[in-house]
A protein has these predicted regions:
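PTP/DSP superfamily signal
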Residues: 103-115, 133-216
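Short phosphate-binding/catalytic loops that engage adenosine nucleotides
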Residues: 1, 34, 143
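A short acidic (Asp/Glu
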Residues: 49, 132-133
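Ser/Thr-glycine-rich phosphate-binding loops at phosphate-binding pockets of nucleotides
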Residues: 125, 129-130
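Cysteine-based protein phosphatase catalytic domain of the PTP/DSP
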Residues: 15-115
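Residue-level preference for the first positions of well-ordered beta-strands
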Residues: 116-120
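Single conserved hydrophobic/aromatic residue that forms the stacking wall/gate
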Residues: 1-12
Length: 216
């Protein structure tokens, strides 16, 4: 579902993947006048489930997700041990800072041209890659950290897992718990990313200016 982030008005929306849009979903995008869709999914993800909406300029800027790319298959095959999911998620959020800063900077370049507005950012569930990017946008607007976190956690109100019901009921308890971890926006993960930013750059402000190349 579409999420409107605090402080960004009608310039920017975030959402999970757009490969299975209903007719109603397409109408909503039409009504919003979305001009640019930035897809943060990996090449493999977009090949498997391409975006079919044709009324906006679609840019693919893939953000790598580390070990978590193999997680769904590991869960289904029963190879996900208790506690693995949390480690995988931590690895993903750390890699946002260590391995994907240039890619996130490319995304933010699109906001420098108002002809691209409104912009919709999309990934698999609209909470991790998109959630981190949104947090950086809000930080650049001097939104307080607690408000940034509140915005990030709103993802939990919109993630629809109904399509997984038939699969999940046949899985082990460990596998079911892993899926819950993967599909939950967790305050600790975003805190981990901010701590990594401080360690690598000294402050969020320096990360925004030196890493993400944002200027006043």
């Amino acid at each position: 579902d579409l999420v409107r982030s605090r402080g960004l008005g009608d310039v920017y929306k975030r959402q999970g993947e757009l490969s299975s849009l209903s007719e109603w979903d397409s109408i909503r995008l039409d009504n919003l006048g979305i001009k640019t869709i930035i897809d943060l999914r990996t090449n493999q993800e977009t090949l498997t489930a391409p975006i079919k909406y044709t009324k906006a300029n679609i840019l693919q800027i893939p953000i790598s997700v580390g070990k978590i790319a193999d997680a769904p298959q590991r869960v289904i095959e029963g190879r996900m041990r208790k506690g693995d999911a949390g480690v995988y998620m931590e690895d993903e959020y750390l890699q946002f800072v260590t391995d994907n800063t240039d890619q996130f900077a490319k995304v933010l370049e699109q906001f420098q041209n108002e002809d691209n507005y409104p912009i919709l950012i999309s990934c698999s569930y609209g909470k991790d890659r998109t959630g981190f990017l949104t947090a950086m946008l809000l930080a650049a607007l001097d939104i307080p950290r607690d408000a940034i976190m509140e915005d990030y956690l709103t993802s939990n109100q919109y993630i629809d897992t109904s399509h997984l019901a038939d699969i999940v009921k046949h899985l082990s308890t460990d596998a079911q718990e892993s899926i819950t971890v993967f599909l939950t926006a967790n305050e600790g993960l975003m805190d981990l990313a901010f701590h990594k930013i401080k360690k690598e750059y000294g402050s969020t402000e320096k990360y925004l200016s030196k890493g993400l190349r944002l200027t006043d």
